[in-house]
Structures are given as C-alpha cells and as structure tokens.
A protein has these predicted regions:
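Short, glycine-rich nucleotide/cofactor-binding loops
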Residues: 7-18, 71, 140-150, 291-298
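Short glycine-rich anion-binding loops that position phosphate/pyrophosphate groups of nucleotides
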Residues: 12, 59-60, 99-102, 109, ...
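Phosphate/nucleotide-donor binding subsite
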Residues: 50-91
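N-terminal phosphate-binding or glycine-rich loops at protein starts, especially the Walker A/P-loop
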Residues: 1-44
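Glycine-rich phosphate/nucleotide-binding loop
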Residues: 108-135, 215-219, 223-334, 340
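Glycine-rich phosphate/diphosphate-binding loop of Rossmann-like nucleotide-binding domains
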Residues: 19, 32, 36-42, 142-208, ...
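Short beta-strand segments
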Residues: 10, 38, 55, 96-98, ...
Length: 340
C-alpha cells in the first residue's frame, strides 16, 4: 500500500505522547508509506526505522497559543515545517495531531487554497454502518455565510465522489427542521442556492438525528455546529457502549448475554472510536492535510497517515478540483460575495 507516497508528520502534539506517535509512524511505515517526521529525535526513537526520516526540531505550537500569530512567528515549529515540506515538494501530504488551529493555519498558509475556494473546510467520515457519510465543516469556520455553506457542499460532494467512491453523492444541509424555511438566515439562504445549483444532488435539510442514519452522503454545517455535533456523537457512542458493558456485568445472566454480544459490541466500539478514522481532512487546499484527533493512540496516528496517503494515491486534490470546476463551484454566484 502507498508505495512511493511520502507524508510529513508533525512529531509533537499527540496527547498520548511521543511513544504513541512513534509507534504509529512505525505502523504506517510498515505499510510502505515513507515518513518525514518533524520532532525531537531522542524522544521519538525512530532512528534506523526503514522508511522513516526524522528531521530534528524542538519548537512546537501548543493548544493554548493563538494559532495564526504563532504560525507566523514560529517558522521552525514542527507543524509549520511539515507544511513547508509539502510546499517544497519533499512530501506529498502532511499530518498533525497537535493544535487544530495551528495545523489549519500552517496548512492554509503553506499549501494554499484551490483556485476560487474561499475557505477550506474540515471534513470527517462518520462511522455510519454500510455506507460512507462525509460531514463538514467540523471546526475550521465557526462563522460562515450562505455562500460558504454552498461551497462546502461542492467540496464535500467532490471529495465523496473522488475518494470515497460515492457516485453522485446526495448532499444535505444540517438544520433544525426539514422545511426549507427552517434554520438561521445563512442556512435558509444556502438552501435556496443549493436547490438551484447545477451539478449537485441536493437532499434538502437534514436534522441532527439524521446524521447517524445516513440520510445524505454528505452533510454540511458551519464549523461551530459541526464540531459540537461531532463531539456529541463521539461522547454518546462512548457512553452507550460503556453503559451496555456495565449492564452486562451487573448480574450473571446479563454477563452470559454480554459474552454473546461481545464480538458485535467490540466491532461497534472500534468503528466508533476516533482511532479508526484517525483524523479530518482539510478540504479546499492544493495538497492534502490531515488534522489528527488529539486523543488518538498509535493506531489513530497510523490511520491518519494512511488516510493522507490514500488521498494522494487516488489523486484527491486534482479530482476534487476538476469536479469543482465541472460543477461551477469556484465560479460565478458561488464565489460572489463570499468574503474572506
């Protein structure tokens, strides 16, 4: 898998520490992915690992720092150097599980946006059984206008078709009701634009309960709503699976049932765990950037790198750009009045 693909990996920021990050790098390298890891050589302990090169740096950007000023000031920070490595052509994609804001800023400044894209959006594949569902924006843009939501819809549809293999994906707009007039002003306006937009299969509004049901192949929201919704789903999944486990241990009869259910519950828990997806993709840039979930372990780090490599392998950026052009998402009304 992924022979010939090189990924620049931020060696700082993973909440589980250098050991988990290094083990994740080893796992990804075992799949044939080449890695250039930016971090402290001694702590990472990756010297001599085939396919892994450590580029020493001791500077990094923490979650408490203001992302944009920090990225501009800390030219040698690990995430900034990872983005620069891709921009310079030394790597094909970048991955960071550090500060989300710093990763987005470094990637946007370093990798640049696709022509006509007003704002990049963070997209994540939801663990919906039986079909891939792409959800965006999950945190890049807290405040948006209607035109941004429309462009997110085109970005998501293009990526879903190009990378997830969904032919003509149906796109839904997250709102408080299915009716076209429900929701905030920008959501209502976006609904009207999407209903008339050429080249997109618009499913209308979807409610929060429709997210795990897979009513649409792509679901679009502003970054605030998307981030809260995603974390609510993750927290609910942990609570429910934990409650089932505790109930199964409550008495001998339930314990027998729990043993019978263990394979199914184990599979469900793995499917819902952040380690499985690894991270979110920053759509709308000229190269691949994956923002890893900060709490993931080695498997999550490896899967974030694998996701980045997969996107490179299938030509996700070029295919997404082509589909955007075909749909007119970077021209005309969709770009007009969108602002910065």
């Amino acid at each position: 898998m992924a022979d010939g693909v090189t990924v620049a990996l931020d060696g700082f920021g993973a909440e589980q520490g250098f050991e988990a990050l290094a083990e994740g790098a080893r796992m990804a390298a075992a799949d044939g992915i080449r890695l250039r890891v930016f971090g402290p050589r001694g702590e990472l302990g990756l010297e001599g690992v085939e396919g892994v090169e450590v580029i020493p740096t001791t500077e990094w950007i923490g979650n408490q720092e203001d992302p944009v000023p920090a990225v501009r000031a800390k030219k040698e920070a690990s995430v900034v150097r990872a983005a620069r490595d891709v921009a310079d052509g030394n790597a094909d994609a970048m991955v960071s599980s550090g500060s989300t804001g710093a990763t987005m800023a470094a990637a946007t400044f370093g990798l640049r946006r696709l022509r006509g894209v007003q704002r990049p959006a963070l997209a994540v594949r939801l663990p919906v059984p039986g079909k891939p569902v792409l959800f965006l924006d999950v945190g890049a843009n807290v405040e948006v206008r209607a035109q941004h939501l429309v462009q997110f819809a085109f970005l998501g549809a293009a990526f879903s078709e190009a990378v997830l293999g969904v032919p003509r994906p149906r796109v839904g707009l997250l709102s408080v009701g299915e009716e076209a007039g429900k929701g905030r002003e920008e959501v209502v306006a976006a609904h009207a634009l999407l209903a008339e937009a050429p080249g997109i299969d618009f499913a209308g509004n979807v409610e929060g309960g429709d997210l795990p049901a897979g009513k649409a192949d792509v679901v679009v929201a502003d970054g605030f709503t998307g981030n809260v919704s995603l974390k609510l789903m993750e927290g609910t999944a942990r609570t429910v699976t934990g409650a089932i486990r505790d109930a199964a241990r409550a008495n001998p009869l339930a314990a027998v049932g729990g043993l019978l259910m263990r394979p199914a519950l184990g599979g469900l828990r793995r499917e819902l765990h952040p380690d499985t997806t690894g991270g979110a993709i920053l759509l709308g840039l000229r190269s691949i950037a994956v923002v890893g979930h900060g709490s993931v372990g080695a498997e999550g780090i490896a899967n974030a790198v694998r996701l980045a490599a997969r996107c490179v392998e299938v030509g996700a950026v070029d295919r997404t750009a082509g589909l955007l052009e075909e749909g007119g998402a970077t021209r005309g009304a969709l770009a007009a009045d969108a602002g910065a």
